[in-house]
Amino acid sequence: MTRTTILIIDDEEPIRALLRFALEAAGYEVTEAANGRQGIDLYRQRPTDLIIADMLMPELNGLDLLLELTREFLHAKVIAISGAGGEQNVLDVAKLLGARQTFEKPFSMPQLMRAVRYELAH
């Protein structure tokens, strides 16, 4: 049986490490990308069951990432996260562009893990 795969896309290494730790502890296989461009390239090579993506990153921000994903991969599941000032506006736009759920940094890990389980089940 293959493990469920999750792609983390965030330019902040500590956030990626935190998410990786929690997700791997829950039994998921995790891949990481440090920016949106790297993330979309990894997803094209090997689509994952879920993406957790920051919305404000260098090279290809999360909103542009969502646009590309929804154009190219209709069924990509994305949870959007953001910690920049005015993040609610960014997260509202992310929802409009196809993010299934959104979280402001700092987020509650138990809430995020519930969202991960929910999205993977639906």
Kindly give the residue locations of the regions a language model identified.
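Active-site residues of response regulator receiver
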Residues: 54
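Receiver (REC) domain active-site loop signature in two-component systems and cognate sites
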Residues: 57
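Charged docking surfaces used in two-component/phosphorelay signaling
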Residues: 17-25
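Acidic catalytic/metal-coordinating carboxylates
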Residues: 35-38, 61-65
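Hydrophobic/aromatic residues positioned on beta-strands within the core alpha/beta folds
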Residues: 81-82
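Short hydrophobic/Thr-rich beta-strand motif most characteristic of the beta2 strand and flanking loop
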Residues: 27-34, 42
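Alpha4 helix (beta4-alpha4-beta5 surface) of REC/receiver domains from two-component response regulators
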Residues: 64, 85-103, 114
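C-terminal output helix
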Residues: 107-117
